[in-house]
Each structure stands twice: as structure tokens, then as C-alpha cells.
């Protein structure tokens, strides 16, 4: 299970080069390296299961999305590529895309505003949903369901509208 992730700033334009490289190294290259090592072990055995923890944040494409969101979007594409390349080998690929999970890290980053995060799940709920998806060898699981629906609706809007809505949200937080 490749599940590392780091987050800097809210918008991509707030990142510096060092933060951007660190985000991409951890969020994307970390999954790639883990998948490569695991795949090389699993291929001779003709069985195995690669799992990536991505994020629902990677589903929306808009200009000012954070590098975290964009790197998780790349993880989603990486999982699709591995799934296709490994089809018929006995190796499964599951991509887990959670929304907000009530972790200590989320609290450290957001403090009291954490309670305002939409559809916040407990760690236990997230683990149970993830484990079920892994056990069932699902290709992809997006949760919580209400956030999945909200993102599905938002993704129908033009990127400029999505960007505007997120900028409004950021201004309200300030």
C-alpha cells in the first residue's frame, strides 16, 4: 500500500520550487517507486495487489488547484496505467480516493476549522471502507459517497467556474 502524501498551501501559485518538488517526490514518485518494487516481486509469482491512497482532491481539474491535488490526479492516472499494463498477470491495482479524514495531521493543519470540512470521516470509517475495497479487489473506491456525488456534479462545470467557486471558498476562510 503506497499511501504517503504531503500538502503545502492551498493554491498552486502559493508554492515555491522546493515545496513543489517535495510534494511531487512524495505524492507521485513515492507511489511510482513502491509500485515498481512491489510489481517486480509480484510478477514472478503471478499474483499480488498494488494499492495507492490517492485523494478525492485529485478528481477535480481546475487552474488554481494545489499541487497536492494535481499530484493526486497524476496518481490516479498512474494507477490506471499500471492496471492496464498488469491486466492478465494476476496482479490487481486498487486506487483509494478518500475525502477528508479526521486525522491528527488534518487537525494540525486546520485547527478548529477542521469541523467545517465537508463530509468528514473518522479514521476507523476510512480504514473499513478501504479494507473492503482491497478485499473485493475493486479498481477504485471514492468516498464518502456524498462527497463523491458533489465532486461528480462539480466536475460537469467549466474549469473557470470551478476555479471561481474554490477562490470564493478560500476568501471566506481568510
Regions found by a protein language model. Give the residues of each.
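Conserved NAD(P)H cofactor-binding loop of Rossmann-fold oxidoreductase domains
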Residues: 3-8
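Substrate-binding pocket helix/loop in short-chain dehydrogenase/reductase
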Residues: 11-12, 16-24
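Active-site helix of classical SDR
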Residues: 35, 71
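Alpha-helical segment proximal to the catalytic Tyr-Lys
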Residues: 40, 84-85
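Residue(s) in the substrate-gating loop at a strand-loop-helix junction
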Residues: 55
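Active-site loop immediately N-terminal to the catalytic Tyr-X3-Lys motif
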Residues: 62-66
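C-terminal helical subdomain
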Residues: 95, 113-150
Amino acid at each position: 500500500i503506497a499511501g504517503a502524501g504531503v500538502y503545502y498551501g492551498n493554491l498552486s501559485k502559493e508554492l515555491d520550487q522546493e515545496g513543489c518538488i517535495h510534494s511531487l517526490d512524495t505524492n507521485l514518485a513515492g507511489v511510482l517507486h513502491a509500485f515498481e518494487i512491489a510489481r517486480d516481486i509480484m510478477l514472478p509469482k503471478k499474483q499480488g495487489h498494488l494499492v495507492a491512497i490517492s485523494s478525492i482532491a485529485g478528481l477535480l481539474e481546475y487552474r488554481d488547484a494545489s499541487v497536492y491535488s494535481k499530484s493526486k490526479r497524476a496518481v490516479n492516472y498512474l494507477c490506471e496505467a499500471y492496471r492496464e499494463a498488469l491486466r492478465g498477470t494476476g496482479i490487481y491495482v486498487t486506487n483509494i480516493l478518500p475525502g477528508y479524514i479526521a486525522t491528527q495531521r488534518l487537525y494540525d493543519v486546520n485547527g478548529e476549522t477542521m469541523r467545517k470540512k465537508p463530509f468528514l470521516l473518522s479514521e476507523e470509517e476510512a480504514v473499513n471502507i478501504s479494507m473492503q475495497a482491497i478485499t473485493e479487489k475493486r479498481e477504485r473506491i471514492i468516498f464518502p459517497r456524498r462527497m463523491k456525488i458533489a465532486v461528480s456534479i462539480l466536475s460537469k462545470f467549466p474549469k473557470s467556474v470551478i476555479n471561481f467557486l474554490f477562490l470564493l471558498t478560500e476568501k471566506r476562510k481568510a
